[in-house]
C-alpha cells in the first residue's frame, strides 16, 4: 500500500504534464478551427473594411469580429489559446522607405511660406494644457466647450450620458469625452493626458487635459511639457477653492510646474459659480488671492486672464446670451472663455534648429504600424525622413505624419504630432526617447550643471540629496552631487560659493548626476539621457526636481558634464 501511494505521488506530476499537453493540443486545434470559421464560404479570406474589421460577405447576417469557437472546446482550452502557445512570433518587416517630397532647403522655404500665410490668415496653432486641483471640473468644462463649438456630436453626447448614468455618475457625462478609459470613468478622475482638437475663429487649439490628482503629477508634467499656454480651472464652491490653493493642493503646484516648463500665458476659469449663486464677492476674492501668487510664480499680469463660468450649464463658455446667464450678466460684461482662448499667442518657433521630438507615447496604429506621439521641440520633419532614436542607435523612416486627425506632408516646431514609423522594431521605441536626424543627434549625458530655483521645501537641499529628475516624459533617479553657488535671482550674480544647504526660495547652481536603479544591478552605472543646455534649445533644457511626491525645485541645464 505504501509503495502504491509513493508511486502514485511520483506519477502525479507526469500525469499533470500529459493533461497540460493534451489541453494545449486541443487549444491549437480550436485556433485552427476558429480561423477556418472566420474565412468566407469560397475558402478565401473575407474582404476587410477600411478600419480592418471583417466585412459582411454575401447576403447573410452580419457577424461579430470574434470567431465562433468550435464545439466541445472548454473555457480552459480557450484561455490557453489566448496565450498564442506554439505560434511563431511576428517580426517587423522592413518596408521600402517613402520618398521625401522636399530637399532640406526647399522644405525650410515651404515651411516659412506656410507659417507666413497662417499668420496673414490669422489662424494660428497653439497647444493648451488644462490644469487644476482634482474635481475642479476640468474635463467637464472642456467636454461642454467642445459641444458648444460643435466639435462633440449629439450621438456621442447621448451615449456618454447613458453610459455615465448606468454607472451612477451622470454628472460626469461631459467629462467622458476626455476620460476614455474604464478606470477613469469608474473612479471619476482623469489619470492620464487626453488630447483633443478645437477650432476657434482665429486659433487651432490642441487641448491637453491633465490629471488633477496628486498621484498622477508625472502624467501632468508630461502634458505640460507639450503646451504653449495653460487653462487653470478652479472650483468656486465654499471650501473647495481653499482646499486646492492651500499647501498640498494641486492648484499651486500645477501653476509652478507649467511656469517652470516655459508656459508664460495662463487663463483662469473660475468654475461652479452657479453653486454660490453667482456671488460676485466670491469671484473677486478668488481672483485677488490668485493674482499675487501668479506674479510670484512668474506670470506677467498682462498675460493672465480671469473668466467666470459654470461648465455644467455651459454658461459663459462660448455664449453670453443664454437666459440662464442673467445672474452673471448683472455684474459681468467681459469676454467669454472662448473669446479669451481665441486671443492666445503662440510663442516663436525655431524651424531652423536641429530636429528634436521627445516621445510622449508609443502605440500600435490601426493601419500603419508603429506610431509615436509628441511635440516637436525644434526643427521640421517630413514624410520620408530617416530619423534616429536616442538613446540607442536605431533608425526609422517617417511613413505618415498626423496632427488633429489630419495627414500632413511635413510638420514644424511647436506642433503636437503623431508619427507612423517603418523599418524599426517597436521594442526600440520608448517614452522619453528623442527622435532626431541622423546627422544632428541630440547629446546624451548622465551628469550636468543646472541653475535651479528651490520652492517651499520643508527639508533643505544638501550635497547628496536624492531626487527624481523630470525631463519631458522621462523621470529618472538622480542625486544633487554638488552645490556650486547661490545666486541672485534677479541678476544671476554669485552670492556665495559652495553653500552647505539650499533653503526655500533660493536660486543656485548645482551639479546633478543620474543614479543607476536597483533593477540594473549593484555595480551598474547610470544610463545617460538625451538632454541639451537651455542656451541651445529651451524646450530640451528645462528640468523639474521632485522628492517624496512634491516638486522641490525647477531649473535649466547650463552645461553637460
Name every feature range the model reports, one short phrase each.
Residues 275-354:
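Canonical P-loop GTPase G-domain recognition
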Residues 203, 217-243, 251-264:
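Inter-motif core of Ras-like GTPase G domains
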Residues 121, 134, 190, 197-201, ...:
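Conserved catalytic network of the ASCE P-loop NTPase/AAA+ motor domain
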Residues 170, 179-189, 243, 293-303, ...:
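Active-site phosphate-binding and catalytic loops of NTP-dependent enzymes
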Residues 135, 141, 160, 188, ...:
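Residue-level signature of catalytic and energy-coupling elements of molecular machines
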Residues 1-26, 33, 37-38, 43-53, ...:
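C-terminal effector/interaction modules appended to NTPase cores
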Residues 213-214, 236-240, 272-277, 311-315, ...:
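Conserved nucleotide-binding/hydrolysis micro-motifs of P-loop NTPases
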Residues 131-133, 139-218, 230-240:
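P-loop NTPase switch module centered on the Walker A-proximal segment
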Amino acid at each position: 500500500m505504501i509503495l502504491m501511494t509513493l508511486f502514485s505521488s511520483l506519477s502525479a506530476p507526469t500525469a499533470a504534464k500529459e493533461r497540460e499537453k493534451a489541453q494545449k493540443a486541443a487549444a491549437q486545434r480550436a485556433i485552427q478551427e476558429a480561423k477556418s470559421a472566420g474565412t468566407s464560404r469560397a475558402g478565401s479570406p473575407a474582404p476587410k473594411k477600411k478600419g480592418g474589421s471583417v466585412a459582411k460577405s454575401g447576403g447573410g447576417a452580419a457577424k461579430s469580429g470574434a470567431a465562433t469557437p468550435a464545439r466541445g472546446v472548454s473555457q480552459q482550452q480557450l484561455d490557453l489559446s489566448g496565450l498564442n502557445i506554439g505560434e511563431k512570433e511576428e517580426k517587423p518587416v522592413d518596408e521600402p522607405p517613402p520618398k521625401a517630397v522636399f530637399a532640406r532647403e526647399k522644405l525650410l522655404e515651404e515651411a516659412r511660406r506656410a507659417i507666413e500665410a497662417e499668420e496673414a490668415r490669422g489662424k494660428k496653432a497653439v497647444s493648451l494644457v488644462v490644469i487644476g486641483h482634482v474635481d475642479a471640473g476640468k474635463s467637464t468644462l472642456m467636454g461642454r466647450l467642445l459641444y458648444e463649438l460643435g466639435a462633440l456630436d449629439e450621438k456621442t453626447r447621448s451615449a456618454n450620458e447613458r453610459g455615465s448614468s448606468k454607472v451612477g455618475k451622470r454628472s460626469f457625462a461631459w467629462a467622458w469625452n476626455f476620460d476614455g478609459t474604464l478606470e477613469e470613468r469608474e473612479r471619476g478622475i482623469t489619470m492620464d493626458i487626453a488630447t483633443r482638437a478645437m477650432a476657434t475663429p482665429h486659433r487651432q487649439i490642441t487641448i491637453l487635459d491633465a490629471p488633477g490628482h496628486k498621484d498622477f503629477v508625472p502624467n501632468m508634467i508630461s502634458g505640460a511639457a507639450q503646451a504653449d499656454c495653460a487653462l487653470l480651472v478652479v472650483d468656486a464652491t465654499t471650501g473647495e477653492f481653499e482646499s486646492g490653493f492651500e499647501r498640498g493642493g494641486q492648484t499651486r503646484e500645477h501653476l509652478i510646474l507649467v511656469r517652470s516648463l516655459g508656459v508664460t500665458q495662463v487663463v483662469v476659469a473660475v468654475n461652479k459659480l452657479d453653486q454660490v449663486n453667482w456671488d460676485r464677492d466670491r469671484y473677486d476674492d478668488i481672483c485677488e488671492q490668485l493674482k499675487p501668487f501668479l506674479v510670484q510664480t512668474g506670470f506677467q499680469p498682462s498675460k493672465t486672464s480671469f473668466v467666470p463660468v459654470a461648465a455644467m450649464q455651459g454658461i459663459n463658455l462660448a455664449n453670453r446670451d443664454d437666459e440662464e446667464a442673467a445672474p452673471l450678466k448683472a455684474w459681468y460684461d467681459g469676454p467669454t472663455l472662448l473669446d479669451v482662448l481665441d486671443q492666445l499667442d503662440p510663442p516663436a518657433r525655431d524651424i531652423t534648429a536641429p530636429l528634436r521630438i521627445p516621445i510622449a507615447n508609443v502605440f500600435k496604429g490601426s493601419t500603419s504600424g508603429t506610431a509615436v506621439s509628441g511635440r516637436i521641440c525644434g526643427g521640421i520633419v517630413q514624410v520620408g525622413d530617416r530619423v534616429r532614436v536616442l538613446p540607442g542607435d536605431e533608425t526609422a523612416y517617417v511613413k505618415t505624419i498626423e496632427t488633429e486627425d489630419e495627414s500632413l506632408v511635413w510638420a514644424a516646431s511647436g506642433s503636437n504630432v503623431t508619427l507612423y514609423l517603418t523599418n524599426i522594431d517597436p521594442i526600440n521605441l520608448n517614452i522619453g526617447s528623442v527622435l532626431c536626424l541622423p546627422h544632428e543627434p541630440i547629446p546624451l549625458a548622465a551628469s550636468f550643471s543646472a541653475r535651479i530655483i528651490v520652492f517651499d521645501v520643508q527639508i533643505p537641499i544638501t550635497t547628496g540629496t536624492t531626487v527624481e529628475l523630470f525631463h519631458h516624459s522621462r523621470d529618472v533617479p538622480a542625486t544633487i552631487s554638488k552645490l556650486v553657488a547661490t545666486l541672485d535671482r534677479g541678476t544671476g550674480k554669485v552670492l556665495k560659493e559652495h553653500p552647505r544647504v539650499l533653503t526655500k526660495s533660493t536660486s543656485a547652481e548645482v551639479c546633478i548626476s543620474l543614479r543607476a536603479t536597483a533593477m540594473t544591478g549593484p555595480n551598474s552605472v547610470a544610463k545617460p539621457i538625451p538632454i541639451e543646455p537651455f542656451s541651445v534649445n529651451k524646450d530640451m533644457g528645462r528640468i523639474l526636481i521632485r522628492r517624496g511626491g512634491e516638486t522641490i525645485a525647477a531649473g535649466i541645464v547650463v552645461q553637460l558634464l
